[in-house]
Amino acid sequence: ATSFMPLSHLLLALLVVFIWGTNFVVIKWGLAEFPAFLFAALRFLFSALPWIVILRRPAVPWNMLARAGLLLGVGQFGLVYWAMREDISPGLASLVVQAQVFFTIIMSMVVTGERARPLQIMALILATCGYGLVAWYSATDPTSAVTLFGFGVVMAAAFCWACTNMVMRKAGRVNMLAFTAWSSLFAIVPLLLISLFTEGADSVVYALTHASGWGWVAAVWQGVGNTVFGFGMWGWLLARHPAVTITPMALLVPVFGILASAVLLQEALPAWKIIATCLVLGGLSLNVYASRARGKR
């Protein structure tokens, strides 16, 4: 792995984070035609098929794949989609779910007993101030594009994402794309059952039979573009460059998410939202810097 990135690799990394950021808008389009948990089930159906036929199952226990699939499918995406139907805008969802970074750090410290470094504590304080601002406006401002319920649900999704990170870390060096495809199998049936019980069989059947071509494009894109291409290319880049060179690019995901939501969905950008975004991104950036400083020692 080399820290030098050719322009083509840099552009590829930018394309991946652009896809991940703008995908929050695509999710919103899909949710206009599918109930939330059904849409999540379709995402994981297209993430698993036909890739499990092409990609060999990673050499990890089945129960590890099942844990990752349930946490990622029901916990992360099921909850994010549920909140995004009515309770949080795509731009804010892309920002709030990044709390997974800090949940992962805290979990790692609990598991390993490692103490937080001063820069990490500062990063956590900055991000907490940003998320506190979002929580305050979600509770007090009816025009804030987020309810307190929506904020809480996406925070829970971020926690589930962090739990998935811990499972994947335990899996060790595996093909990330194969791991994602095979673990997706375990998300499909639970999400479909939740959809049938909470959204009703009638709405499920109606959505499947009446969705437009664009609705299906949004569903397929979740699996093919966002998951298979996104994770596949990200894994390819991580195999060729150090993580400290590649992972900072992910900071642009909420930036693209917020900008795409503003341009394509006319999501308002009041001052408090810009300040909250800067605080969270400041915290995330400081955390990346802390990781780099630690890596150089």
Named regions from a protein language model:
Residues 30, 39, 43, 83, ...:
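Hydrophobic/aromatic residues within transmembrane alpha-helices
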Residues 45, 51, 68, 107, ...:
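Hydrophobic transmembrane alpha-helices of multi-pass small-molecule transport proteins
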Residues 48-51, 104-105, 110, 142-203, ...:
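Transmembrane alpha-helical segments that form core, pore/gating elements
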Residues 5-10, 32-37, 41, 58-63, ...:
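Juxtamembrane helix-entry segments on the extracytoplasmic side of multipass membrane proteins
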Residues 38-48, 81-121, 157, 243-262:
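Specific alpha-helical transmembrane segments that line the substrate/conduction pathway
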Residues 18-46, 88, 92, 163-188, ...:
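Juxtamembrane helix-loop-helix junctions in multi-pass membrane proteins
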Residues 18-19, 23-27, 52-97, 105-107, ...:
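Specific transmembrane alpha-helical segments of multi-pass solute transporters/efflux pumps
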Residues 40-42, 93-99, 167-188, 223-263:
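Helix-helix packing/entry segments at the starts of transmembrane helices
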